Every structure is written in structure tokens, then in C-alpha cells.
Amino acid sequence: KASIIGELRHDASNVEVVAISKDKKWGLVNIGDVSGWTFMRFLRTRNRPDTALRLFCHGVEPTWSMSLDGDAVFKILNDDELFLGAIETIASLNSTDRLALRSKSVTGALTAHIGAQQCEDTTSNRAFGLSVNALITSDEGSAYYSGCCQLVP
């Protein structure tokens, strides 16, 4: 018997399922910094969110992170944060498993593509359910980053 690492409330939302068992009865979910299995019968699929997504995205080489919670904030390890302003969400017209995000401020701009696909973080050996490709533009030029995202409760 496996140990219980956490619990999902009966009304929990934004539960990120990153993998499904072969028999499709169990889903691997992230709870904070750990992953665990939950019985899929207790979860309901929501393909297109009805509220703004709150995401934390990150990648390596260089180590970077991005907070997407109403506003976009981008940071490279040991560097200053780049405030990118309010986020505009653009849903795909022909797919429910991807979307684009756009943000612009006086300090920089963001164009990001978020996709619902398994993504692995090689530094933590954790699986995530969302991948990201982000183009960041600032006074220093433009740079393209790829990585993983997770839902923020």
C-alpha cells in the first residue's frame, strides 16, 4: 500500500493530470512539489477553462521561470525580474488543448504557446501536463525559451 501524500478537496479545481494509467483508472497529479495517483472516477474533464489560467512555467539552460497570474513576470536565475504586464489569452480556433498568451509592458513583451502535452523537467525528474514555448522581447533583444508549466491552485 502506498502512502498518502496529500488530498484533493471534493470541490478542487485546476487539478493537473499529467499521466493516466494503462487501465485509465488512475491519474498522476501534481500536488505542490510532489506527484501522486488519484482515482480518475472522482475527476471531471474540463477542456477549455472558464476562468483565467494561473500558471508557473520553468525551464533549464539557462534556468528560467515565469509566473502567469493575471500579469506575466519572467525571471532568469540570478537576474532581475522582467515585468511583462497583463496577459491576453488567445484560444485556438480549432483545438481545445492549446492556447496562446500575449503580454506587453514598457520593459518587454511575451508571446507564449501553451500545449496540453506531457513535459518532463530533467532537473527534478517530475512530469508536467503542460509545455510552453515563449518568446521574450526586452531592451536587450529577443530570446526563445522552452519548458514546462504547472497549474497554480
Feature locations, PLM:
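Short amphipathic beta-strand/extended segments with alternating polar/hydrophobic composition
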Residues: 3-9, 38-40, 77-94, 113-114, ...
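Central antiparallel beta-sheet cores of small beta-barrel/beta-sandwich binding domains
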Residues: 58-113
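Boundary regions of SH3-family modules and the immediately adjacent low-complexity/disordered segments
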Residues: 22, 27-65, 124, 129-134, ...
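Short polybasic amphipathic segments
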Residues: 1, 71-77, 130-134
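Short, well-ordered turn and helix-capping elements at secondary-structure junctions
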Residues: 12, 42, 116-118
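A generic short-segment signal for beta-strand/edge and adjacent turn/coil regions
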Residues: 6-7, 25, 34-37, 43-45, ...
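Beta-loop motif signature
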Residues: 1-25
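Polybasic/polar functional segments that serve as interface/processing modules
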Residues: 91-104, 108, 112-127, 133-142, ...
